[in-house]
Amino acid sequence: MSTLQAVKYIRGKLEVLDQLRLPHEFHYDEVSNRTEAFDSIYTMRVRGAPAIAIVAALGLAVELHNGSCTASSAEETIGQIEEALDYLKESRPTAVDLTNAINQLKARIREVGSTATKEAIISAFIEEAEKIFEKDLKTNLSIGDFGAEWLRAQVGASPEQQISVLTHCNTGSLATSGHGTALGIIRTLQAKKLLHHAFCTETRPYNQGSRLTAFELVFEGIPSTLITDSMAASLFRTRKQEKNIAAVIVGADRVVRNGDTANKIGTYQLAVLAKHHGVKFIVAAPTTSIDLETETGDGIKIEERKKEELTQVTGAVIKPDGTVDESSKVRVATADQRINVWNPAFDVTPAEFIDAVVTEKGAIEKGPDGKFDFSQILPERWAKITGA
Protein backbone atom coordinates (compact mmCIF):
# COMPACT_ATOMS: atom_id res chain seq x y z
CA MET A 1 0.00 0.00 0.00
CA SER A 2 1.28 3.44 -0.94
CA THR A 3 2.04 5.91 1.83
CA LEU A 4 0.93 8.77 -0.40
CA GLN A 5 -2.08 10.55 1.11
CA ALA A 6 -4.10 13.33 -0.47
CA VAL A 7 -5.98 13.78 2.79
CA LYS A 8 -4.89 13.49 6.43
CA TYR A 9 -7.68 13.55 8.96
CA ILE A 10 -8.31 13.16 12.66
CA ARG A 11 -11.50 14.45 14.21
CA GLY A 12 -11.26 18.22 14.39
CA LYS A 13 -8.32 18.55 11.99
CA LEU A 14 -8.04 18.15 8.22
CA GLU A 15 -4.89 18.52 6.12
CA VAL A 16 -5.00 18.44 2.32
CA LEU A 17 -1.97 17.88 0.11
CA ASP A 18 -1.44 20.85 -2.23
CA GLN A 19 -1.15 18.96 -5.50
CA LEU A 20 -0.29 22.08 -7.47
CA ARG A 21 3.14 21.97 -5.81
CA LEU A 22 3.84 18.38 -6.82
CA PRO A 23 6.11 16.76 -7.82
CA HIS A 24 8.66 19.28 -6.57
CA GLU A 25 7.24 20.14 -3.16
CA PHE A 26 5.29 18.11 -0.59
CA HIS A 27 3.08 20.53 1.35
CA TYR A 28 -0.16 20.06 3.29
CA ASP A 29 -2.67 22.89 3.75
CA GLU A 30 -4.82 22.91 6.86
CA VAL A 31 -8.50 23.08 5.94
CA SER A 32 -10.65 24.19 8.84
CA ASN A 33 -13.89 25.43 7.29
CA ARG A 34 -16.18 25.38 4.25
CA THR A 35 -14.48 28.36 2.58
CA GLU A 36 -11.05 26.75 2.73
CA ALA A 37 -12.50 23.44 1.51
CA PHE A 38 -14.23 25.20 -1.42
CA ASP A 39 -11.03 27.05 -2.34
CA SER A 40 -8.93 23.88 -2.15
CA ILE A 41 -11.30 22.14 -4.57
CA TYR A 42 -11.96 25.05 -6.93
CA THR A 43 -8.27 25.93 -7.36
CA MET A 44 -7.51 22.23 -7.93
CA ARG A 45 -5.10 21.93 -5.03
CA VAL A 46 -7.12 18.77 -4.48
CA ARG A 47 -8.75 16.94 -7.39
CA GLY A 48 -10.21 13.59 -8.28
CA ALA A 49 -13.92 12.97 -7.78
CA PRO A 50 -13.62 10.85 -4.59
CA ALA A 51 -11.08 13.19 -2.96
CA ILE A 52 -13.21 16.24 -3.76
CA ALA A 53 -16.20 14.72 -1.98
CA ILE A 54 -14.06 13.73 1.00
CA VAL A 55 -12.53 17.20 1.40
CA ALA A 56 -15.92 18.91 1.14
CA ALA A 57 -17.48 16.59 3.73
CA LEU A 58 -14.58 16.61 6.17
CA GLY A 59 -13.90 20.33 5.76
CA LEU A 60 -17.40 21.14 6.95
CA ALA A 61 -17.16 18.43 9.64
CA VAL A 62 -14.06 20.13 11.07
CA GLU A 63 -15.80 23.51 11.02
CA LEU A 64 -18.80 22.11 12.87
CA HIS A 65 -16.64 20.17 15.33
CA ASN A 66 -14.81 23.35 16.25
CA GLY A 67 -18.03 25.16 17.16
CA SER A 68 -18.89 27.36 14.19
CA CYS A 69 -22.61 26.63 14.16
CA THR A 70 -24.59 29.61 15.51
CA ALA A 71 -28.01 27.98 15.29
CA SER A 72 -30.26 28.00 18.34
CA SER A 73 -32.61 25.20 17.29
CA ALA A 74 -32.49 21.85 15.53
CA GLU A 75 -34.35 23.17 12.50
CA GLU A 76 -31.98 26.11 12.20
CA THR A 77 -28.98 23.79 12.58
CA ILE A 78 -30.16 21.62 9.69
CA GLY A 79 -30.78 24.74 7.61
CA GLN A 80 -27.28 26.13 8.23
CA ILE A 81 -25.60 22.82 7.41
CA GLU A 82 -27.61 22.38 4.21
CA GLU A 83 -26.75 25.93 3.15
CA ALA A 84 -23.05 25.16 3.64
CA LEU A 85 -23.38 21.94 1.63
CA ASP A 86 -25.10 23.75 -1.24
CA TYR A 87 -22.22 26.22 -1.29
CA LEU A 88 -19.65 23.41 -1.43
CA LYS A 89 -21.52 21.71 -4.27
CA GLU A 90 -20.63 24.60 -6.60
CA SER A 91 -16.88 24.07 -6.13
CA ARG A 92 -16.84 21.29 -8.79
CA PRO A 93 -20.28 20.72 -10.33
CA THR A 94 -19.24 18.02 -12.83
CA ALA A 95 -18.08 15.58 -10.12
CA VAL A 96 -21.10 13.49 -9.12
CA ASP A 97 -19.33 12.03 -6.06
CA LEU A 98 -19.59 15.48 -4.49
CA THR A 99 -23.32 15.69 -5.20
CA ASN A 100 -23.89 12.17 -3.87
CA ALA A 101 -21.91 12.88 -0.70
CA ILE A 102 -23.90 16.06 -0.12
CA ASN A 103 -27.19 14.22 -0.61
CA GLN A 104 -26.03 11.48 1.77
CA LEU A 105 -25.08 14.01 4.43
CA LYS A 106 -28.36 15.90 4.05
CA ALA A 107 -30.32 12.68 4.35
CA ARG A 108 -28.46 11.76 7.53
CA ILE A 109 -29.10 15.01 9.37
CA ARG A 110 -32.75 14.96 8.28
CA GLU A 111 -32.98 11.39 9.56
CA VAL A 112 -31.84 12.58 12.98
CA GLY A 113 -34.74 14.99 12.71
CA SER A 114 -35.84 18.43 13.73
CA THR A 115 -36.66 17.21 17.25
CA ALA A 116 -33.05 16.27 18.03
CA THR A 117 -30.60 18.56 19.77
CA LYS A 118 -28.19 20.75 17.87
CA GLU A 119 -25.31 18.69 19.23
CA ALA A 120 -26.87 15.40 18.06
CA ILE A 121 -27.32 16.73 14.54
CA ILE A 122 -23.73 17.95 14.35
CA SER A 123 -22.44 14.66 15.75
CA ALA A 124 -24.45 12.71 13.17
CA PHE A 125 -23.03 14.86 10.37
CA ILE A 126 -19.44 14.36 11.51
CA GLU A 127 -19.85 10.60 11.84
CA GLU A 128 -21.42 10.35 8.37
CA ALA A 129 -18.61 12.41 6.82
CA GLU A 130 -16.06 10.09 8.43
CA LYS A 131 -17.89 7.05 7.03
CA ILE A 132 -17.56 8.48 3.51
CA PHE A 133 -13.81 8.81 4.04
CA GLU A 134 -13.35 5.32 5.47
CA LYS A 135 -15.50 3.58 2.86
CA ASP A 136 -13.57 5.03 -0.08
CA LEU A 137 -10.37 3.05 0.58
CA LYS A 138 -12.24 -0.27 0.78
CA THR A 139 -14.05 0.64 -2.42
CA ASN A 140 -10.81 1.34 -4.27
CA LEU A 141 -9.21 -1.95 -3.24
CA SER A 142 -12.26 -3.80 -4.57
CA ILE A 143 -12.14 -1.88 -7.85
CA GLY A 144 -8.50 -2.89 -8.21
CA ASP A 145 -9.31 -6.56 -7.71
CA PHE A 146 -12.31 -6.61 -10.06
CA GLY A 147 -10.40 -4.71 -12.74
CA ALA A 148 -7.41 -7.02 -12.62
CA GLU A 149 -9.64 -10.10 -12.80
CA TRP A 150 -11.57 -8.68 -15.75
CA LEU A 151 -8.32 -8.13 -17.63
CA ARG A 152 -7.15 -11.61 -16.74
CA ALA A 153 -10.34 -13.04 -18.22
CA GLN A 154 -10.72 -10.75 -21.22
CA VAL A 155 -7.17 -10.27 -22.51
CA GLY A 156 -5.38 -13.22 -20.94
CA ALA A 157 -3.24 -11.24 -18.53
CA SER A 158 -0.96 -13.60 -16.60
CA PRO A 159 2.51 -13.61 -15.05
CA GLU A 160 3.69 -15.37 -18.21
CA GLN A 161 1.87 -12.96 -20.53
CA GLN A 162 1.98 -9.60 -18.82
CA ILE A 163 0.10 -6.69 -20.32
CA SER A 164 0.79 -2.99 -20.74
CA VAL A 165 -1.83 -0.30 -20.19
CA LEU A 166 -2.32 3.40 -20.79
CA THR A 167 -3.93 5.73 -18.26
CA HIS A 168 -5.02 9.36 -18.37
CA CYS A 169 -5.11 12.12 -15.76
CA ASN A 170 -4.57 11.05 -12.14
CA THR A 171 -6.74 8.44 -10.46
CA GLY A 172 -4.49 7.12 -7.72
CA SER A 173 -3.87 7.78 -4.04
CA LEU A 174 -3.73 11.49 -4.78
CA ALA A 175 -7.27 11.49 -6.20
CA THR A 176 -8.87 9.32 -3.50
CA SER A 177 -8.43 8.25 0.11
CA GLY A 178 -5.86 5.70 -1.08
CA HIS A 179 -4.94 3.09 -3.74
CA GLY A 180 -7.03 4.77 -6.44
CA THR A 181 -9.53 3.75 -9.10
CA ALA A 182 -7.93 3.39 -12.55
CA LEU A 183 -4.46 3.65 -11.05
CA GLY A 184 -5.68 1.28 -8.35
CA ILE A 185 -6.25 -1.36 -11.04
CA ILE A 186 -2.72 -0.74 -12.30
CA ARG A 187 -1.39 -1.12 -8.74
CA THR A 188 -3.24 -4.42 -8.39
CA LEU A 189 -1.96 -5.65 -11.77
CA GLN A 190 1.56 -4.88 -10.58
CA ALA A 191 1.01 -6.66 -7.26
CA LYS A 192 -0.30 -9.76 -9.06
CA LYS A 193 2.63 -9.71 -11.51
CA LEU A 194 0.27 -9.14 -14.43
CA LEU A 195 1.70 -5.77 -15.50
CA HIS A 196 4.49 -5.34 -18.01
CA HIS A 197 4.43 -1.55 -18.36
CA ALA A 198 2.22 1.46 -17.61
CA PHE A 199 2.04 4.44 -19.94
CA CYS A 200 0.59 7.73 -18.71
CA THR A 201 -0.39 10.84 -20.62
CA GLU A 202 0.78 14.24 -19.44
CA THR A 203 -2.91 15.31 -19.46
CA ARG A 204 -2.93 18.85 -20.72
CA PRO A 205 -3.63 21.55 -19.82
CA TYR A 206 -3.21 20.97 -16.06
CA ASN A 207 -0.67 18.18 -16.44
CA GLN A 208 -2.15 15.88 -13.81
CA GLY A 209 -0.54 12.96 -15.60
CA SER A 210 2.99 14.33 -15.69
CA ARG A 211 2.82 16.04 -12.29
CA LEU A 212 0.88 13.45 -10.32
CA THR A 213 0.48 10.06 -12.03
CA ALA A 214 4.11 9.93 -13.12
CA PHE A 215 5.04 10.88 -9.55
CA GLU A 216 2.95 8.03 -8.10
CA LEU A 217 4.26 5.47 -10.59
CA VAL A 218 7.88 6.39 -9.90
CA PHE A 219 7.22 6.53 -6.15
CA GLU A 220 6.00 2.91 -6.20
CA GLY A 221 8.58 1.58 -8.63
CA ILE A 222 6.04 0.62 -11.29
CA PRO A 223 7.68 0.36 -14.75
CA SER A 224 6.26 3.34 -16.58
CA THR A 225 6.66 5.85 -19.38
CA LEU A 226 5.23 9.34 -19.77
CA ILE A 227 3.86 10.43 -23.16
CA THR A 228 2.17 13.57 -24.45
CA ASP A 229 -1.56 13.40 -25.07
CA SER A 230 -0.96 13.59 -28.82
CA MET A 231 1.28 10.50 -28.87
CA ALA A 232 -1.40 7.93 -28.02
CA ALA A 233 -2.30 6.98 -31.59
CA SER A 234 1.34 6.51 -32.51
CA LEU A 235 1.90 4.49 -29.34
CA PHE A 236 -0.88 2.07 -30.27
CA ARG A 237 0.23 1.81 -33.87
CA THR A 238 3.94 1.27 -33.25
CA ARG A 239 4.19 -0.32 -29.77
CA LYS A 240 0.97 -2.27 -29.24
CA GLN A 241 2.38 -5.65 -30.25
CA GLU A 242 5.85 -5.13 -28.80
CA LYS A 243 4.56 -4.00 -25.39
CA ASN A 244 1.31 -6.03 -25.46
CA ILE A 245 -0.77 -2.90 -24.88
CA ALA A 246 -4.13 -4.38 -23.94
CA ALA A 247 -6.15 -1.63 -22.31
CA VAL A 248 -6.74 2.02 -21.62
CA ILE A 249 -7.87 2.47 -18.02
CA VAL A 250 -9.41 5.77 -16.94
CA GLY A 251 -11.39 7.11 -14.02
CA ALA A 252 -14.66 9.02 -14.11
CA ASP A 253 -16.16 12.13 -12.65
CA ARG A 254 -19.63 11.01 -13.69
CA VAL A 255 -21.09 7.90 -15.33
CA VAL A 256 -24.71 8.41 -16.38
CA ARG A 257 -27.49 5.86 -16.76
CA ASN A 258 -26.62 4.71 -20.29
CA GLY A 259 -22.89 4.48 -19.53
CA ASP A 260 -21.78 7.76 -21.11
CA THR A 261 -18.86 8.95 -19.02
CA ALA A 262 -17.54 12.40 -18.14
CA ASN A 263 -13.85 12.42 -17.36
CA LYS A 264 -10.81 14.62 -17.81
CA ILE A 265 -10.60 16.34 -21.19
CA GLY A 266 -8.82 14.05 -23.63
CA THR A 267 -10.53 10.87 -22.47
CA TYR A 268 -12.93 10.76 -25.42
CA GLN A 269 -10.16 10.85 -28.01
CA LEU A 270 -8.36 8.00 -26.23
CA ALA A 271 -11.54 5.91 -26.37
CA VAL A 272 -11.88 6.50 -30.11
CA LEU A 273 -8.23 5.58 -30.67
CA ALA A 274 -8.50 2.48 -28.49
CA LYS A 275 -11.51 1.21 -30.44
CA HIS A 276 -9.74 1.79 -33.76
CA HIS A 277 -6.63 -0.09 -32.62
CA GLY A 278 -8.40 -2.98 -30.88
CA VAL A 279 -7.43 -1.93 -27.35
CA LYS A 280 -9.90 -2.44 -24.49
CA PHE A 281 -11.26 0.74 -22.89
CA ILE A 282 -12.13 0.52 -19.20
CA VAL A 283 -13.74 3.06 -16.90
CA ALA A 284 -12.90 2.54 -13.22
CA ALA A 285 -15.28 4.27 -10.83
CA PRO A 286 -17.02 3.75 -7.50
CA THR A 287 -20.79 3.39 -7.62
CA THR A 288 -20.98 6.85 -6.06
CA SER A 289 -19.81 8.18 -9.44
CA ILE A 290 -22.79 6.60 -11.23
CA ASP A 291 -25.57 9.11 -11.84
CA LEU A 292 -28.78 7.25 -12.66
CA GLU A 293 -30.85 10.44 -12.75
CA THR A 294 -29.09 11.70 -15.89
CA GLU A 295 -30.06 9.56 -18.87
CA THR A 296 -27.25 10.42 -21.32
CA GLY A 297 -24.04 12.38 -21.50
CA ASP A 298 -25.88 15.28 -23.10
CA GLY A 299 -27.24 16.11 -19.65
CA ILE A 300 -23.83 16.50 -18.00
CA LYS A 301 -22.77 20.04 -17.09
CA ILE A 302 -19.18 20.54 -18.27
CA GLU A 303 -17.07 22.95 -16.26
CA GLU A 304 -15.00 25.45 -18.24
CA ARG A 305 -11.74 26.74 -16.82
CA LYS A 306 -9.85 30.01 -17.19
CA LYS A 307 -7.72 30.66 -20.28
CA GLU A 308 -4.47 31.05 -18.32
CA GLU A 309 -4.35 27.29 -17.73
CA LEU A 310 -3.55 26.93 -21.44
CA THR A 311 -1.46 30.02 -21.99
CA GLN A 312 0.73 29.94 -18.86
CA VAL A 313 2.59 27.31 -16.87
CA THR A 314 4.33 27.20 -13.50
CA GLY A 315 7.31 24.99 -12.74
CA ALA A 316 10.47 24.57 -10.73
CA VAL A 317 13.62 26.23 -12.04
CA ILE A 318 16.25 24.09 -13.75
CA LYS A 319 19.78 25.06 -12.69
CA PRO A 320 22.61 25.38 -15.24
CA ASP A 321 23.92 21.96 -14.15
CA GLY A 322 20.57 20.34 -15.02
CA THR A 323 19.34 19.77 -11.46
CA VAL A 324 15.96 20.99 -10.22
CA ASP A 325 15.79 23.88 -7.77
CA GLU A 326 12.64 22.83 -5.91
CA SER A 327 12.64 26.01 -3.81
CA SER A 328 12.41 28.29 -6.84
CA LYS A 329 9.27 28.48 -8.98
CA VAL A 330 8.61 30.53 -12.09
CA ARG A 331 5.48 31.19 -14.14
CA VAL A 332 5.97 31.61 -17.87
CA ALA A 333 3.79 32.32 -20.90
CA THR A 334 3.40 29.46 -23.38
CA ALA A 335 1.24 31.34 -25.88
CA ASP A 336 0.33 34.83 -27.00
CA GLN A 337 -1.78 36.06 -24.08
CA ARG A 338 -4.23 37.73 -26.50
CA ILE A 339 -5.37 34.48 -28.12
CA ASN A 340 -8.91 33.26 -27.49
CA VAL A 341 -9.03 30.01 -25.51
CA TRP A 342 -11.63 27.26 -25.09
CA ASN A 343 -10.82 25.24 -21.99
CA PRO A 344 -13.42 22.62 -20.96
CA ALA A 345 -12.18 20.63 -17.97
CA PHE A 346 -13.97 17.44 -19.04
CA ASP A 347 -15.34 15.65 -22.07
CA VAL A 348 -17.95 12.92 -22.43
CA THR A 349 -17.08 9.49 -23.82
CA PRO A 350 -20.13 7.78 -25.38
CA ALA A 351 -20.92 4.35 -23.94
CA GLU A 352 -20.37 2.72 -27.33
CA PHE A 353 -16.61 3.20 -26.89
CA ILE A 354 -16.47 1.71 -23.38
CA ASP A 355 -15.88 -2.03 -22.89
CA ALA A 356 -16.44 -2.19 -19.14
CA VAL A 357 -17.26 -0.02 -16.15
CA VAL A 358 -15.42 -1.46 -13.15
CA THR A 359 -16.93 -0.67 -9.74
CA GLU A 360 -16.46 -1.97 -6.22
CA LYS A 361 -19.39 -4.32 -6.92
CA GLY A 362 -17.97 -5.83 -10.08
CA ALA A 363 -17.18 -5.17 -13.73
CA ILE A 364 -20.23 -4.22 -15.79
CA GLU A 365 -20.26 -4.93 -19.52
CA LYS A 366 -22.79 -3.89 -22.15
CA GLY A 367 -25.64 -6.30 -22.80
CA PRO A 368 -26.73 -7.77 -26.16
CA ASP A 369 -28.50 -4.47 -26.87
CA GLY A 370 -25.18 -2.62 -26.61
CA LYS A 371 -26.25 -0.78 -23.46
CA PHE A 372 -24.99 -0.79 -19.89
CA ASP A 373 -27.43 -1.98 -17.24
CA PHE A 374 -26.59 -0.86 -13.72
CA SER A 375 -29.78 -2.26 -12.20
CA GLN A 376 -28.03 -5.38 -10.86
CA ILE A 377 -25.43 -3.48 -8.84
CA LEU A 378 -27.69 -0.56 -7.85
CA PRO A 379 -31.16 -2.15 -7.56
CA GLU A 380 -32.63 0.29 -5.04
CA ARG A 381 -31.38 3.41 -6.79
CA TRP A 382 -32.40 1.98 -10.18
CA ALA A 383 -35.94 1.20 -8.99
CA LYS A 384 -36.30 4.62 -7.40
CA ILE A 385 -35.25 6.45 -10.58
CA THR A 386 -36.82 4.27 -13.26
CA GLY A 387 -39.77 2.80 -11.39
CA ALA A 388 -38.73 -0.64 -12.64
From Swiss-Prot:
What metabolic or biological pathway is this protein involved in?
A: Amino-acid biosynthesis; L-methionine biosynthesis via salvage pathway; L-methionine from S-methyl-5-thio-alpha-D-ribose 1-phosphate: step 1/6
Q: Show the GO MF annotations.
A: S-methyl-5-thioribose-1-phosphate isomerase activity
The source's superkingdom equals Eukaryota
Query: Quick one: a GO cellular component term?
Result: nucleus
Q: Which UniProt keywords apply?
A: Amino-acid biosynthesis, Cytoplasm, Isomerase, Methionine biosynthesis, Nucleus
Q: Show which residues form the site (Transition state stabilizer).
A: 169
Record's Gene3D superfamilies? Answer: translation initiation factor eif-2b, domain 1, Translation initiation factor eif-2b, domain 2
* Record-stated family: Belongs to the eIF-2B alpha/beta/delta subunits family. MtnA subfamily.
Instruction: Tell me the PANTHER family matching this sequence.
Output: METHYLTHIORIBOSE-1-PHOSPHATE ISOMERASE (PTHR43475:SF1)
Q: Which NCBIfam families match?
A: eIF-2B_rel (TIGR00524), PRK05720.1 (NF004326), salvage_mtnA (TIGR00512)
What protein does this entry describe?
A: Methylthioribose-1-phosphate isomerase
User: Which gene name does the record give?
Assistant: MRI1
